[in-house]
Every structure is written in structure tokens, then in C-alpha cells.
């Protein structure tokens, strides 16, 4: 039976967890004195909080639902996604984190990614900022909706309630503590949620192995009923492997992850944060992959019915553990959803308040008004994402992959070149961003090649950046700022 009936212990653990997150939001509510506090936490985040916050905000409900579900359906071939993500995240921490932290604080006090791009390319016309803001609002609205779908599936499966009621409940919880607490609340809850996610992902596959009779026995069952699931290459085309590995390219352009680099206390904290972040990620991704593979064996051995593969973690948590423990483990999904959705809502709100209203329409606006506009932005994006999420048949992985590709192609290419090529120009950045986003949208909707849209999007954007930059002039001051950044490394 896929859905376990609602019981008091699981309900109590969910309520306790949700109240804890809301308390953290209330606690930091009065500490937000200005927009920099609300959007970047005053740049006071230490290495542990920065690393776990980056990881938790990155992974979302996809880590506990989308990825195990993908491996349950397709087998180890989809583990290339995890490999690509680990490589991409490592490169992001090693090559991007320090340069971005220096640029956004030493060169100019940039609070948002559009802030950074405008300063980096001396864009006094605000064209780049507007393009950035539009891309962020479009793709983050889809990204937030994936989190809301995950939350709705969680509540629906756990409590047996209707999808629309489940969707409404999850949305209210996520919006409430983001609305109140701002960046510090998001980072502190991310740290707690990151630890909870890792604990759950380690415990569940270990208990599954115990019930299956060990790793060898589990693999024998999988080999007997679905041998192709254990192959990472047999019968799989190179296009599929490239597409899976290409997920790593997306890291260079994810605003909700990049702001973690901007808010870290000091560049001296980055090496430790890098180690913690990558170690956390490797453990979580490996464990999530194993849940999917072991799920194949468990469902077959115990003759279970699983209509939705993305619920394999939920079903295993309900079946294998005492209801009180199951409540804690299932709270890990809520943690993953809340950590990512709240970070994305915060970036979206800063885009509306800082990048649209303050920078374009009224630069002398008082900080407390920017703060309030940011909170209204949280509500606006959440409402639109809620409407997108009303289709209960939506795939979490499909929605995430689209938004991930959009940011990776449009922002990722521009971010990478902006930090490593002093000759890059404002025109190159604008055209690269537009063509990257447009290529993703067109490829997703009209191409049937099987190639993940981030690959052509990133490549086209990179070519456009190089050509446009070589045929246009670098604006005065940008080279000097670039050289200043290099001296600070």
C-alpha cells in the first residue's frame, strides 16, 4: 500500500518541525535593520553555515524525491546527474566563490547578482539589470513551484489529504518564515535542514539494506528483475550521458547558491566551507542514489505497489520506522523543500525591491521601504508559483531541470566569463544572457534530440559572449576593477 494512513506521531513531528522553523523566522525578524541585513545577513555568515546553507538551498525536495525516483525508474544511468552535480559544485566553490566575494564587497557593495553584473560591466543604462531581473523572476517562479509540488506530494502521501489542501499548507509554511526572517533566518534554518537531510539520507538506505539481507543480496534481486538498472553505460547513448553530466554546468548560474558566496564572512573562510560543502553533497547524493536502487529490490521482494516513483523515500520511511522516527525522517523532505524555496523566494524578492524599484525607479528610497517591498515580492512570486503547482501530475525533476538549465545557460556563462576574462564587455554580457535563456526555452519546446537544453544553451551563450565582446569596447573602469580583484585574490 503506497499511502500510510495519518497517525498522531508523524503529525506531531511535522508540527514541531514547522513551529521550530517559524520560531527561527520570528527570532531574526527584529534583527533585520536594513535591506542588506534582510538580503545578505550583513555578510556575517561563517564557513559551516555558508557551506550547509549553500548545499541545502541547492538540493531542494529533488534530492529526496526526484533523484531517488529517477534511479528507481532508470537505474544507475541517472547517477551521472549526481556525478555532474558534484563536479560542478566543486568547481563553483573552487573557482567562483572567492572572486565573487571580492568583487561584490571590495569593488562595490553589491547585494544581488544583477547588482554585481551592473557594477562589473559599468552598465549605467540598467539594461543588464533588467534582463537579469526578468530571467530570475521567470525561472525562479518555476523553480519555486517545483518545491511546492514536492511539499504537496509529501503531505498528500503522509496524511492522505487532498493535493490542493496539501499544496496550500506547504506554501503557507514556506512563505511565513521567509517573509519574516530574511537571509539570516534562511541560512540558519538551512544549516539545521542540511544536517537533518544528511541524517535521513544515511539512515534510510542502511535500514533498507538490513531488511534486504545486505548489499549483495539486494543487488542480486535487482540483477534478477531489472539488470539494466545496474549498468552505467550498456544500452545508453552518449547523448544521455552528456546530458546527465551537464547538470554540473548549472552551478555557475544559480543565484540562490551564488549569494552564499557573497555573504560569507571572509575569503579566508572559503577553503573550509568548500570542504564541508562538497563532503556534505557527496554523502547526500550517494545516499539518495542508493535509496532509488535499493527501492527496486525492496518493492519487488515485499510485493509493494508504488504508483509514483518520486515517493519511494516517503514510502520507505513510513514502512521501515517507528512513526515518531518516520516523522523526523519525513521532516527531512520538508526541510529540503523549505530550504530551497525560501532561498529562491528571497532572491526573487530582492530582485523586485533592489533591482527593479530601487535601482531603476527610485534610488533615494529609504531602506525600510525596500525591506517591505522585498517582503511583498515574496508573496507575489509565491502566489504565481502556487498557481503553476496546481497540476498534481507535475514531475519535480522535470520542473527543476528546466529552471536549472535556464539559469545555467543564461547566468552561468556570463558569470564564468565575467570572473575570468577582463576583455568581456557589457554588450557581450547582455547578448550572452538573452541568447542563453532563449536557447533553453526553444530547445526545451521544439528540439527532440534528447540532449539536455543546458548544453546548447551554455555553448551558444559562450560563443555569443566571446564574439560580441571582441567586436565591442570595454567600458572605462571595468578593467581597473578587474585588476583590483586579481590583487585581492
Language-model features and meaning:
Residues 1-489:
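Membrane-embedded helix-loop-helix hairpins and adjacent transmembrane boundary segments
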Amino acid at each position: 500500500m503506497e499511502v500510510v494512513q495519518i497517525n498522531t506521531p508523524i503529525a506531531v513531528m511535522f508540527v514541531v518541525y514547522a513551529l521550530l522553523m517559524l520560531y527561527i523566522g520570528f527570532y531574526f525578524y527584529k534583527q533585520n535593520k536594513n535591506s542588506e541585513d534582510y538580503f545578505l545577513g550583513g555578510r556575517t555568515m561563517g564557513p559551516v553555515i555558508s557551506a550547509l546553507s549553500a548545499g541545502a538551498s541547492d538540493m531542494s525536495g529533488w534530492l529526496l524525491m526526484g533523484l531517488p525516483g529517477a534511479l528507481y525508474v532508470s537505474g544507475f544511468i541517472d547517477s551521472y546527474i549526481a556525478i555532474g552535480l558534484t563536479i560542478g559544485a566543486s568547481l563553483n566553490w573552487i573557482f567562483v566563490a572567492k572572486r565573487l566575494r571580492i568583487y561584490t564587497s571590495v569593488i562595490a557593495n553589491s547585494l544581488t547578482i544583477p547588482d554585481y553584473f551592473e557594477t562589473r560591466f559599468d552598465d549605467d543604462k540598467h539594461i543588464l539589470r533588467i534582463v537579469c531581473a526578468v530571467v530570475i523572476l521567470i525561472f525562479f517562479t518555476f523553480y519555486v513551484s517545483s518545491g511546492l509540488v514536492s511539499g504537496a506530494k509529501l503531505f498528500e502521501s503522509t496524511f492522505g489529504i487532498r493535493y490542493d489542501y496539501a499544496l496550500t499548507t506547504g506554501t503557507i509554511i514556506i512563505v511565513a518564515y521567509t517573509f519574516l526572517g530574511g537571509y539570516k533566518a534562511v541560512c540558519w534554518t538551512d544549516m539545521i535542514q542540511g544536517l537533518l537531510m544528511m541524517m535521513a539520507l544515511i539512515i534510510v538506505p542502511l535500514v533498507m539494506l538490513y531488511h534486504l539481507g545486505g548489499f549483495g543480496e539486494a543487488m542480486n534481486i535487482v540483477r534478477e528483475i531489472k539488470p539494466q538498472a545496474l549498468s552505467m553505460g550498456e544500452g545508453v547513448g552518449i547523448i544521455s550521458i552528456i546530458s546527465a553530466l551537464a547538470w554540473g554546468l548549472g552551478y555557475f548560474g544559480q543565484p540562490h547558491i551564488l549569494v552564499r558566496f557573497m555573504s560569507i564572512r571572509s575569503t579566508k573562510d572559503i577553503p573550509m566551507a568548500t570542504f564541508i560543502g562538497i563532503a556534505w553533497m557527496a554523502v547526500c547524493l550517494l545516499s539518495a542514489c542508493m535509496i532509488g536502487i535499493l527501492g527496486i529490490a525492496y518493492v519487488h521482494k515485499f510485493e509493494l505497489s508504488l504508483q509514483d516513483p518520486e515517493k519511494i523515500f516517503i514510502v520507505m520511511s513510513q514502512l521501515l520506522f517507528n512513526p515518531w522516527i518516520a516523522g523526523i525522517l519525513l521532516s527531512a523532505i520538508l526541510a529540503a523543500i523549505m530550504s530551497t524555496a525560501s532561498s529562491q523566494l528571497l532572491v526573487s524578492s530582492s530582485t523586485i525591491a533592489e533591482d527593479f524599484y530601487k535601482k531603476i525607479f527610485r534610488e533615494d528610497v529609504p531602506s525600510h521601504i525596500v525591506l517591505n517591498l522585498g517582503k511583498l515580492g515574496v508573496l507575489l512570486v509565491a502566489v504565481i508559483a502556487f498557481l503553476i503547482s496546481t497540476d498534481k501530475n507535475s514531475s519535480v525533476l522535470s520542473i527543476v531541470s528546466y529552471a536549472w538549465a535556464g539559469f545555467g545557460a543564461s547566468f552561468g556563462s556570463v558569470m564564468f566569463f565575467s570572473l575570468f576574462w577582463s576583455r568581456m564587455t557589457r554588450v557581450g554580457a547582455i547578448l550572452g544572457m538573452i541568447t542563453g535563456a532563449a536557447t533553453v526555452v526553444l530547445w526545451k519546446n521544439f528540439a527532440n534530440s534528447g540532449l539536455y537544453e543546458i548544453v546548447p544553451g551554455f555553448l551558444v551563450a559562450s560563443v555569443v559572449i566571446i564574439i560580441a565582446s571582441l567586436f565591442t569596447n570595454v567600458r572605462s573602469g571595468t578593467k581597473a576593477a578587474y585588476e583590483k580583484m586579481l590583487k585581492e585574490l
